[in-house]
């Protein structure tokens, strides 16, 4: 009879094999964790459609998804109330190569951050949620209208959480991995605050507008930009310049499509 402390060669080999399997599994978990930036397989894109609140997948989304899929991308789509504070918080962890932010955006008015850009979520504002971020000034109450109108007051407008550049740098989890980010809403590059925050968070290039922009115009320009880069193989700088020439500035507000930082003119998306 074998003593309690005695192991046969077969049992010893089995224990070693189990230990090795556990070690390999642990290593694998670290290799595939979503915030590592390392990934295999086809490039990935996401369309973040905060503008759509009632009926998902407007024509722009259908056309752009088809264009991306033909170029070999896996495409995810989120819309409306799915675009929460925590959705933005976790966005870098998903390993996207291309992020299309079809979302309202604007400029902070007044205070120390006057003129900084911010992004709308689709999550109704509450003074009792995300208190740490609110107290730190990384979230704000965002609302919008068509302009001064005596028929309504501020309290009558819908209110949403908005995220500011400091939220991108300090509250988003993980890092982007040389991601191209297209901010399709207004004023994304009126100042460089939001774009620089994305760059500091690991993005490669940010594309947006230097003023107000209408929904139809940003849809048309973004679709053409992607065609030029994905189908024609143009660099970011050349594609933006060509889009400006072909599509032109916004017909109502005169805003222009820009990209940041300027030295990324030769970059392409996967």
Residues of each region from the PLM?
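N-terminal Sec-pathway targeting helices
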Residues: 2-21, 30
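Short coil/turn linker and secondary-structure boundary residues
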Residues: 7, 82-83, 231-234
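A diffuse structural propensity rather than consistent per-protein peaks
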Residues: 8, 83-89, 153, 160-165
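Juxtamembrane cytosolic interface motif at the C-terminal end of transmembrane helices
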Residues: 27-34
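A domain-level signal for caspase-like cysteine endopeptidase catalytic cores
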Residues: 34-145
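Catalytic cores of nucleophile-dependent amide-cleaving enzymes
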Residues: 126-219
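Active-site-proximal C-terminal subdomain of hydrolase catalytic domains
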Residues: 179-270
